[in-house]
């Protein structure tokens, strides 16, 4: 008789465990997707509002296309640092680069 009284409690406990496990897995998948940065290619980025000033559809589409081309062809603003200079121990000055191989000016 004791088992019949505990049956609703057991069902509620199992239901609670299943819902918390499902919520935990749902949060885990959302968390992993949120940490991955969304990198959108510049070509597919939303166009600037300046193209909305064109009333003709052809001019507006050309403006959007030119903005996409311009946005995707941008170069990074920083350049790599120059290599460190080497000091020649013999002369105490900076080493110079000397080309190797045959002289291209000599026939």
Swiss-Prot record:
What InterPro entries does the record point to?
A: CLE9-13
Question: Locations of Basic and acidic residues compositional bias?
Answer: 87-97
A single Gene Ontology CC annotation of this entry is: apoplast
**Which residues are reported to carry the modification Hydroxyproline?**
99, 102
Which keywords does this chain's UniProt record carry? Developmental protein, Differentiation, Glycoprotein, Hydroxylation, Secreted, Signal
A molecular function annotated in GO for this UniProt entry is:
receptor serine/threonine kinase binding
Q: Does the keyword Secreted apply?
A: yes
Q: Which family does it belong to?
A: Belongs to the CLV3/ESR signal peptide family.
State what protein this is by name. Answer: CLAVATA3/ESR (CLE)-related protein 10
Q: Which organism is it from?
A: Arabidopsis thaliana (Mouse-ear cress)
Designated gene of the protein: CLE10
């Amino acid at each position: 008789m004791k088992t019949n009284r505990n049956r609703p409690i057991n069902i509620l406990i199992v239901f609670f465990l299943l819902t918390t496990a499902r919520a935990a897995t749902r949060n885990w998948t959302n968390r992993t997707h949120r940490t991955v940065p969304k990198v959108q290619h510049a070509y597919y980025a939303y166009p600037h509002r300046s193209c909305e000033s064109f009333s003709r559809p052809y001019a507006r589409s050309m403006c959007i296309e030119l903005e996409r081309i311009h946005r995707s062809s941008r170069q990074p603003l920083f350049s790599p640092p120059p290599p460190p200079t080497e000091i020649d121990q013999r002369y105490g000055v900076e080493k110079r680069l000397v080309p190797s191989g045959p002289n291209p000016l000599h026939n």
